[in-house]
Amino acid sequence: MTLDEAVISRHTVKAFDPAQRVPQEKIDTLLNVLHNSPSSVNSQPWHFVVASSEEGRAAMAKSATSNFIYNKPKIADASHVIALCMRSDLDEAHLQKVLAQEEKDGRFVADGAKAGQDKGRRSYVDLHRYEQRDLPQWMEKQVYLALGGLLLSAAMLGIDATPMEGFDARELDLALGLREKGLTSVVLVSLGMRSEQDFNAALPKSRLPRDEIFTFI
């Protein structure tokens, strides 16, 4: 499948076939995409919880309550569900861990590169923590960068996907024990193969005209 074909053909699946499983090698490819997702100053303020078992999906489905009950089948019937989570803070331990990994991976060749990277990253963290006071929103933006790559990659692999903000984040955090780990859930993505009940598959894609959303200068 070409990139153009993937962009046009992908859609948010409304019903999954519970009998269909995504092959593990394709899941591994998607995990590699998430692992290598870009983030501002390589901050990597995320964690991904992958539910592949019936028990795991059931735990995540607990968050589809009340106004979000319509999303429960999309979680329970999927092959895999990934909870994209963010850190509650970019603390000293995390910043040191990222810096140490960069050094281990050979990122610092020039003299002073390590100190420069550390200083630059901290300046952005401090900017969002103190001046702009939007550190959680900034971290959340990085998670959505990962989401975009995941959805496009799934389409390229012929995997159907459903991104969901319609869930109770508090319930999911409790079900997965996220908060005691310094994490909170941001968005869910169900992966699998659509069923015949997926009405969205037969509907045309609808976007505003190109001349309304692009400006060339």
List each language-model region with its residue ranges:
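Acidic, surface-exposed loops and disordered segments
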Residues: M1-I217
